[in-house]
Amino acid sequence: SCLNFNFYNVVISPGSRNVPLAIGFASNNNFKCYSIVDERSAAFFALGLSQRSKEPTILVCTSGSALLNYYPAIAEAYYSEIPLIILSADRPTYKLNIGDGQTINQNNVFEKNILYSKSLKQDCTHSTEEIIKSNKQEIIDGKSTASSILSKQKSIQNDNELIIEEAFNNCINNNKPIHLNIPME
């Protein structure tokens, strides 16, 4: 989706939960990736890239409190009308609110300083056993067949593609930051 919208600059704050996103961007030569360990510095660096290029920069971080370090740059982008795309990795629903360290509610975390914020739906073909066991997500149950799980995944993928398209269009058309929260195993 990012390439379809001609988004090429990606600033990655390394972490464990966002490894699939980092690998996805870094392994594609169409993206210009920057790895900056300190989240606050990474966010302001991304802000500068977008300010210079007048194009959205993708900003990627891991789950939990790391995301909050982006907040000052996001607020600056919001009030200065600078487009940023924040992609945060998150724990799946069944791993939230169980007392794990560095876990926060990432939904709408930038509420008053973000144009658009949504959480994508959880992939149901990865870690199916864990999803069934906890079933807090109510995505699939123990009686689901392989065929019904694949059908459900197609529906999830379609919904996520619509959310992404809406988010990216909002970012482009309004020159404001958007946030997509991505649940990952």
Show which residues each predicted segment covers:
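N-terminal alpha/beta PP-like core and its mobile active-site loop of ThDP/TPP-dependent enzymes
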Residues: 1-185
